[in-house]
Amino acid sequence: MTDFGTANDAVAICKAVMISIAPDARIMDITHGVTPFRIEEGARNLESVSPYYPAGTVFVAVVDPGVGTSRKAIVVKTKKGQYFVLPDNGLITPVIDRDGLDSAREITNQSWMIQAAISSTFHGRDIFSPAGAHLAAGWDFNLVGPVVPQLVRLTLKTSTTTDKGIEGNIIALDDPFGSLVTDIPGDEFKKLGYSLGDKFRIEINKKSVVLPYVKTFMDVPVGDVLLFIDSRDRVSIAVNQANYSKKFGVEPPGTIFISRKGAPIKDK
């Protein structure tokens, strides 16, 4: 997973490095479309995807605005037995919050890096990809380098439930469809008292929007807005067969407020 995009050769080069070290490894792409430099967006992607992979899986993740600085390159082993090769910039925060931290080590062993001069701007090629490939090839995690006693953490915003309703955050777009993904768990939303088919008013970035709570997109006419619980069990906002983000000019980060059923919308 990276923020490299696919319009240049960076991803192909990283994969070539991996294959040259671990030719039998199965390399799968999570995404290379993380918004450039948005560490939290990348972290949320890792959080969302990693539960579907088995113990022993090696994830290489590069969203690294601090490349070439004093920030550490690390390998994290979770208590679930998965490995994450990435910069120590908080990219791993939501994963270890959920799965627990077994150990973290700084990548200092030169034999785990590309055997050439290390670029100051392409650690994805020179450090993260070869380190991940060595792990996938069965090299001992303990040989990566010294233990990192404390990791850099992201300060993640979380939804808050009160007697008035839920205040949450728009944390991502479901591209290419442009749906707004929030951090409000489906179970928390359901405690507000709404039933499928209910139509009500919410606030997105403090602007009122009237929309129905439905199960899926075709439960409303084409072009209408809707609120639904997505496949990750998060409240999401969409337009049936259109791009909500482009239609209404809303992008993350942002805020959302949903009042309890029967309660007045929050004062402006």
Language model features with spans:
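Short acidic, Gly/Ser-rich segments with clustered Asp/Glu that frequently serve as metal-coordination loops
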Residues: 4-8, 66-69, 244-247
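Alpha-helical scaffold segments in soluble metabolic enzymes
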Residues: 13-17, 45-48, 94, 130-134
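Pepsin/retropepsin-fold aspartyl endopeptidases
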Residues: 243, 253-264
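Anionic-ligand-binding alpha/beta catalytic cores of soluble enzymes and soluble regulatory domains
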Residues: 116-188, 192-194
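A conserved acidic, glycine/proline-rich C-terminal tail/linker
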Residues: 181-249
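A residue-level signal for conserved active-site and pocket-lining positions in enzyme catalytic cores
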Residues: 3, 131, 240
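Active-site histidine-anchored catalytic micro-motif
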Residues: 9, 21-27, 38-44, 53-62, ...
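N-terminal glycine-rich anion-binding loop in soluble enzyme alpha/beta folds
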Residues: 1-33
